[in-house]
Amino acid sequence: MSQTCQTGYAYMQPFVQIIPSNLSLACGLRILRAEDYQSSLTTEELISAAKQDAEKILADAQEVYEQQKQLGWQAGMDEARTLQATLIHETQLQCQQFYRHVEQQMSEVVLLAVRKILNDYDQVAMTLQVVREALALVSNQKQVVVRVNPDQAGAIREQIAKVHKDFPEISYLEVTADARLDQGGCILETEVGIIDASIDGQIEALSRAISTTLGQMKVTE
């Protein structure tokens, strides 16, 4: 056993610490008390436990950091998906607005062109053509009353015979003035119902057909 003399003060008496390769006894101490050695061991255990606790705290902190890092990444991805969905929705709305605008413009252009062409025709001749087409729909009726614009009623009466001869099934055909109708207006009254064959009505039907066609094109796309 070797003896090392050191000067110092501690909360307990100097003692010998047993180390496998070395055993040293404090200066002036010949006997190692059991309680002193046990106290030394307890102190070392506390230090060791403290180190383990510190290591565990560091490990837990690292784990929490990784978890928060993963949560941050996931939150970023969720935010990106939300932003993407918002942009897609806004783009779809803009496309719908654009299509509606184009649809309205196309419809207006087509209808304007049709009206311009119709205005170049003789209005009485055009009304007679409308009457002819309407009579074809009710040719199985015996009696038909044709209502037209008052300004055209006289001219239509003078020429209605030319149209009537193509529909011999109709035994009675009368032309009467109706102030509610514009030029080109034509309403046929029969025993089973009324048919509005006015040019304005046909143009409106054309407008609806254009809108329907454009709507189907958008769905297909």
Swiss-Prot record:
Induction conditions: At 37 degrees Celsius in the absence of calcium.
Function: Component of the type III secretion system (T3SS), also called injectisome, which is used to inject bacterial effector proteins into eukaryotic host cells. Acts as a regulator of the YscN/SctN ATPase activity.
Subunit structure: The core secretion machinery of the T3SS is composed of approximately 20 different proteins, including cytoplasmic components, a base, an export apparatus and a needle. This subunit is part of the cytosolic complex. Interacts directly with YscN/SctN (T3SS ATPase) and YscQ/SctQ (the major sorting platform component).
One Pfam family it belongs to: FliH
Native species: Yersinia pseudotuberculosis serotype I (strain IP32953)
Gene Ontology CC annotations of this record: cytosol
Annotated keywords: Cytoplasm, Plasmid, Protein transport, Transport, Virulence
InterPro entries named in the record: Flagellar_FliH/T3SS_HrpE (IPR018035), T3SS_SctL/SctL2 (IPR012842), T3SS_Stator/FliH (IPR051472)
Gene Ontology terms describing biological process: protein secretion by the type III secretion system
Superkingdom, taxonomy of origin: Bacteria
NCBIfam families for this protein: HrpE_YscL_not, PRK06937.1
Principal location: cytoplasm
Localization in the cell: Cytoplasm
UniProt similarity note: Belongs to the SctL stator family.
Protein's UniProt name: Type 3 secretion system stator protein
